[in-house]
């Protein structure tokens, strides 16, 4: 069980801080909920049942784990299928898993494809671009918390790690 002020990764809300644990006003039962405040969205609030098995939540990874993943991104196997439908499905599953490593693999695969396309004057398709943004937002938010830096600084840190791929 998580505690108030813990920072977690939530499947649909990204990186969130647990603002409260209790029974919200809108609930008619005594069921307790986590009240989540997304790190990247100052106005949003998410309520998740305390004992829900249907929702994926995890603690943020450690600073050491993040540093290892970022420093070894060149060794990670990228996720990028030639089949558009299969690729989109793989991306969606990886992003929904909220796993730091899998999201980095998505970013690496799409970044490598973007670089290949740039050489021939082509752009990424909209689906790949959208998935790159989603994975990047999740990783940047988690890095921001882990390294205690701004989202922009986290994006630059990730881009620097990915830059080793180019």
Each model region followed by its residue ranges:
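A positional/architectural concept
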Residues: 1-55
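Charge/polar-rich, low-complexity and marginally structured segments
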Residues: 51, 55-166
């Amino acid at each position: 069980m998580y505690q108030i002020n813990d920072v977690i990764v939530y499947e649909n809300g990204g990186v969130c801080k647990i603002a409260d644990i209790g029974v919200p006003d809108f609930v008619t039962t005594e069921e307790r909920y986590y009240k989540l405040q997304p790190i990247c969205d100052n106005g949003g609030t998410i309520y998740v049942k305390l004992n829900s098995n249907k929702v994926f939540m995890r603690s943020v990874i450690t600073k050491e784990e993040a540093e290892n993943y970022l420093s070894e991104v060149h060794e990670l196997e990228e996720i990028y299928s030639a089949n558009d439908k299969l690729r989109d499905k793989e991306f969606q599953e990886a992003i929904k898993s909220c796993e730091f490593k899998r999201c980095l693999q998505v970013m690496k695969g799409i970044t490598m494809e973007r670089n290949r396309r740039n050489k021939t004057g082509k752009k990424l398709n909209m689906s790949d671009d959208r998935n790159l943004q989603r994975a990047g937002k999740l990783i940047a938010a988690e890095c921001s918390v882990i390294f205690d830096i701004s989202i922009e600084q986290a994006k630059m840190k990730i881009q620097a790690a990915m830059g080793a791929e180019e």
